[in-house]
Amino acid sequence: MRRLFLLLLCLALVGGCARQPSVQEPEPEPIPAVREEAEPPSFSPERYVPPPWKGSEPQQGAPIVPQPGDTAACWDMARAGDFAPDDDCSDGELLAKWLAVEGLTLSDLEDRGCTQLVLTVAREEDGVSTLTTCYVMEDNAWHAQPGLTRMAGYTGSNGIAHDRRRNTRQSPAGLWALGSAFGLASQPAGLLLPWRDITPQSDWVCDAASPYFNTWQERDDPLITQLWDLQDAEHLEDYSVTYRYACVIEYNTPPYTVPDRGCAIFLHCSDHPTSGCIGLLEEDMVRTLLWLDPRENPYILITGHEKPR
């Protein structure tokens, strides 16, 4: 009996265990499908759009005199004696020297919002050959731009003058804004300055009696062509080498035009003295153009030694 009782007890226990709900382990979460890394969103860097080309607006009303940057009243060559000869100056010393000679300070550049400066110095040997160095304001200090220092070039064939007059073949000393670029060659890739192609109709008006004096005009515009003497204009296409690449120096341009001070003063290609412009070898001219940025409000300081008389 005892054995029978134990057997029945075991069967009851086994049956009871079988009826107990089994403890289920949680189902594993599904493994997400392996996906390739998504491409980063494509974007284009903000495209820089140069400002409009300037140089065709006529003088309105009486000219503003003197033009800002005219250093005729404040320059003093004696100040050069406080510095070493140019060839012995560092690039920084060279800038300090010729700012001082022109009666200018770094504050004069700051006041103009200028953070790019082209310094052209007429050399003592002849007053006609030049050295040109480009400077940029970075970290609250002026630095010479590598690769754009002591570039050889030329002034007008009669050197520089602080009270420049027309037909003197002199370059205007002083601090002048650099404006738009133009040329007979193709626009350099990467240029930031506004650019204008020279056409067979392009004139730079030199007629002192014209309201368009010292501006670019197209002679095929019948509405205005009669407003200047076609014989008293630079027909830009005729300057096949000089104007391959050029940049307007804003000397005596509207609203400052005084006709007897002259016109058509540019930074352009040249391997010899000019009629009054500042010349650089073409390779240096192109590299300088590509460096210039209108957002930096670039200026040129034309200074140095006058041509020996």
Locations of regions flagged by a protein language model:
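N-terminal, intrinsically disordered, polar/charged segments of Gram-positive cell-envelope systems
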Residues: 21-92
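Extended catalytic/binding region for NAD+/ADP-ribose chemistry, centered on the ART fold
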Residues: 276-280
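Positively charged n-region of N-terminal signal peptides that target proteins for export
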Residues: 1-4
